[in-house]
Amino acid sequence: MILMAFAVYAIQGCHSASTANTADSTATKDTTKAAAAGTAAVDSSDVKFADNAAGGGMAEIELSKLAQQKSTNTKIKNFAAMMVTDHSKAGDTLAVIAKNKNITLPTALDADHQKKLDDLSKKSGADFDKAYVKIMVEDHNGALKLMQDEAANGKDADLKAFAGKVAPTVQMHIDAINKIKAGM
């Protein structure tokens, strides 16, 4: 873009004012077209990643809010609080990336995650804690694979970098929930 701007200014120096205005107008149109093409060029696999990551993160938040209310285990409540904080931060970052790329992220839980939330909400005590831990282990293992796959194979640089940055946090969550599981 800098070279394009320089070229437009160089052309302006060589031509009359009306020709320069035409060059400016053409350069602006070309730049706008390039920017629009850049947002439309996000690969479908990257869009699917963003959708899955956002949906999974949203589910972790909702499940963990429920755990903060219903669990009787302090370690689980602390883990759930960490989930809400970490997944909210990651979700906010992903939302900015998605907005810049015109990717529409889900605003509600998908059917699978909604069923998990509904089923979990019916449990209490030790049954609740065991079910929550089981879901966290399964979902985080899936999330780690999702992040690692995108970090290794993603085509969009921003989403690839996001996945690479989030993967170690997901691994830390796996380690923490497995430690809680081992102590139950």
PLM regions with names:
Residues 1-184:
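His/Met- and acidic-residue-enriched segments that coordinate or traffic transition-metal cofactors
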